[in-house]
Amino acid sequence: MAVFHAFRALRPTPEKAADVAALPYDVVNREEAKSIGDENPLSFLHIDRPEMDLEPETDLYDDRVYEKAKENLDNMEEKGILVQDQKACYYIYELVRKGKTQTGIVGCSSIDDYMNGVVKKHELTREDKEQDRIHHVDSCNANTGPIFLACRYPDSLLTLMNNWKDHHEAAYDFTEEDQITHRVWVIDEDEVISEINKEFAGIDSLYIADGHHRAASAVKVGLKRREQNPGYTGEEEFNYFLSVVFPYDQLCILPYNRIVKDLNGLTVKAFLGALKFNFELMLMPGFPCRPVEKHCMGMYVDGQWYHLKAWPDIYEKKDVVGQLDVSILQEKVLRPVLGIEDPHTDQRISFVGGSHKAAELAEIADRTGGVAFVMYPTSMEDLMKIADENKLMPPKSTWFEPKLRSGLFIHKL
């Protein structure tokens, strides 16, 4: 039984929503954030990447960075750019990309559900990244970015959302430069809010699709606040974290591709020879190779594209993690052939989201005489199965598109 909680969102006025909305903090680097922020003083990146408003040499984890985030957030609220709703509401958030629509409900998930496994994880988190977001949440006294969750939606909840959309005007409706449309409806009727609470109480599991570090950080902030307030009731806002829950079958997972800077001292001939023990190799002259089925991948090396198909005897079909394409690549190529022991920390490997063209990967690989791998995307079914078994996926296994925008909903603690 999932606990889902309506809340009083701090959010932009309708005329400012498109300007405030920003990509998540962790998909833009410092230079990109600075460029966006310089052009748009209302961008929420001024809160999520506040180092852009400090000296260029400022350390990302300097206390002044977190103080600046708080200052920028307060300024936007004081100027009336962000306004808090007067009553607790749910919100419908719809994204449309290339004709495909995903529609979810924005509310707050319980930190207890996270700890007892109702909110399920599939990815390891890094302590340094957790500490960064803990400091950010503490300083802002708010969850500033939603956790991207998925579940098996009951038909009745889908019907409720569609009925509300059909009979109410959207609070926000705008299309960004990337041609992704964002729409938001505010659910403010007590009867409908109660019905949503009941619907979620009948849902057994919520799955983190994206945002493991933000979720872990929000939970740790909540637990710390409980220690500081031993008389807490469980109803305080710090007991909940900002989430958007989508039907799992509406989501689009793109591949998370890999580029290795070199061939680990091997010649191209020796490298290709090593692959033939575990893969069927086919030269694909003249065009980039994108795999069209599981256990296949495209590879670019030394000016040529290849199609790789894993031999069926190199993975255990019942091993939900081991049969993932990213696992096969790691265990049969990256570790034994290319010497990538830990993809979390090895500086020779980089990860490129599936929104980038295959030709871009080839160009990057050519710069250092390396190799690029174009993966087949992991499925939501595999993700949920792994989470249900309390197992972990390899790092950078999934790339979700479209990216949820930060700044449309802020949950004050």
Label the predicted regions.
Residues 1-413:
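Surface-exposed, charge/polar-rich loops and edge strands
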